């Protein structure tokens, strides 16, 4: 590409592509996904784990409430809930007061699954943040939470 003022400006902007937030977040997520596959022997995904945790802690929830608690979008929750219901991890039913809503409930199998996965997920977190001291880990998680909160606000 011939050097021009515009091209030089673009080159300066893209030169450090490996340091862009999206790229770094994707790499971190890739590391998490790889570690999940290595460390968590329970047949469950990260999103399924979070959904089961929400139901285990809060009891029966409609899908909108699950979305608020887990930051999962409606279509993801609907797809997850369908798969998880087929596996017997949760039950889905129509809300008695508002037939448009679907209420999710963790089953005994779901409770066993989340309990079996929890120590491995904890271990995954320890390995993922092994190079950080406790204060750095807390600060990093705070930063990630704030980025997520900002994205959710629009």
Task: Kindly label every feature range from the protein language model.
Residues 16, 20, 24, 50, ...:
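Amphipathic alpha-helical recognition patches that constitute DNA-binding helices
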Residues 1-16, 135-154:
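C-terminal regulatory/oligomerization modules of transcriptional regulators
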Residues 1-42, 106-108:
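N-terminal leader segment of winged-helix/HTH proteins
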Residues 23, 30-76, 87:
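N-terminal helix-turn-helix DNA-binding core of bacterial DNA-binding proteins
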Residues 57, 91, 116, 146, ...:
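Conserved amphipathic alpha-helical interaction elements at protein-protein interfaces in regulatory
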Residues 4-5, 33, 60, 82-142:
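Charged, amphipathic alpha-helical coiled-coil/dimerization segments
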